[in-house]
Amino acid sequence: MTALKNSFNRLGCVLLGAFLSGSALAQTPDVQVTEPGFKVFQFPKNQIPRIDGSFADWDVVPDRHVVPIEEMWDDSRKHQGINKSTLDIKVKVGWVEGLNRLYFYYEAYDDFWDFNTLGLRNDTYEIVVDADLSGGPHIDQFRHNQEALTRFESFFLHQNVHAQNYHIMTPPTEGKSWTMVWGPQQWLKDLPYANYAYDYNFKHGEDGVLKFEFYITPFDYASPDGGPAASTESKLYEGKKIGLCWAVIDYDGGPGNNGFWNLSKHHKMYGNASMQRLFTLMPLEAQFRKPIEAKW
């Protein structure tokens, strides 16, 4: 009798285990922004980057804060690995206490700079920011309740509202805006919420190095129809963790792109803030603190 009871117990455990395993397999785990992440350098208040195209202000940023192309991958799978003789990228990100701005320094070498049309087709640095880690979809294509809301309705309700996407032209064709804000909040790309400066010496189809600095202002709520007055800036402070990601869309003269170099392992990070990378707003470096602060 005891042996029979033990057999039933073992059978029950097996069936329960199979049920739980099947349930777990049937559920797709939610993607999340997790460690390991990257560091956002804190500029001293008397060394705020001047957006002037000289870039000397960025010399104080240590190399450990640089995000190189080695952190990215071509998720279009046109390239099996990194070849710096055709494309090389490095990015620095900074912030300043008291200003709700994210500063960027972008430097890239390309063997074929593509920027001769007025359409969206352009060598592009695409960035997405979710400064309160609210996560989830923020473009109409990935909207919830797709049976109730059309893409058109969702665009004017949700697009770029809790996380923002910028398609930055590197560099822009003459006559074209420096960035496409992917939503109705076009004021995001203008002063005082953004500014930019480029430096390059090449023409379309040539190789060379582009240097570019800019800042943007992240918003926890960027009103789709009420403008800045109806919107809520993200509050930036020391130690805060934010969602941030980027991709480089490389064109080389052909009909389509020649690579989508992504900082995220998820291709759809451009429209789902849960697929971004984690960035932490760092304290001042020791040499910029007062002596008592450095000891503390």
Task: For each feature predicted by the language model, list its residue ranges.
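Bacterial N-terminal signal peptides that target proteins for export
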Residues: 2-15
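Conserved, single-site charged/polar hotspot
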Residues: 18
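Structural preference for beta-rich elements and adjacent junctions enriched in aromatics
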Residues: 27-296
